[in-house]
Amino acid sequence: MKYRIAFLLLFLNSFCSVVLSQDDDVDIDEWQVMKVEAAKDPFANGSQFTINFANYTKEEWCYPLPGAKVNSPFGGARHHSGTDLKTFGGDTIRAAFPGEVILSGPYYAYGYCVILRHANGLETLYSHQSRNLVKVGQWLHAGDPVGLEGQTGRATGIHLHFETRVNGRAFDSARIFDHENHALIRQIFVVTKQKNGTLKFTAEQVE
């Protein structure tokens, strides 16, 4: 009987390991508002602002983890707050847009984490890094190194947990990045603050 129990426990442990390996974040299941320096309100002049990504040059943006594949997308049943990007491990993570470092260091379940605040009204977050390569207050150009892909915090595999945010609230990065082709989507991106405080994201495609 004890051998059957031992076999069952071994099977369950193996099964759980397989399930976790398919979705590397075991922690960041809800949209989280992080305590960082207050941002200039992008809605200070009205309930809407736009970003014309169609006019961005190659110097103004960079895919955050070149060569990566999506291991776990945004949202889903557990409300995953970011997009998990994965390479073979240890690769350099890069700034998606020009911006200022407003957080750099260990941050609870995120592990070694960096947040950049961009002039276009967005923030980007990079977490589970093995090492941060930037300091708070530093200004980065698009493509500058942010850190090294890792497994710090509560994560079961080496990867980058990447978030795009407005006013500290996460939205799907696939709205602005074509993850399959590692490209910025050429569009006029519109963010509207609704009367109940929620944010609505729409896009006008540009030929």
Predicted features and spans:
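Polar/charged, compositionally biased leader and regulatory segments
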Residues: K2-R4, L8, N13-G76, N181-E207
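Short, glycine/small-residue-enriched coil/turn segments at secondary-structure junctions
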Residues: Y56-C62, G75-P106
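A structural signal for short beta-strand/turn segments enriched in small hydrophobics and glycine
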Residues: V70, I93, G99-V101, G137-E149
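Residue-level recognition of beta-strand microenvironments
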Residues: P73, S104-G105, N132, E149-T152
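Zn2+-dependent peptidoglycan hydrolase active-site motif and core
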Residues: H80, A95-L133, H159
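Conserved, short, structured surface segments that act as functional micro-motifs
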Residues: V114-H118, Q138-K195
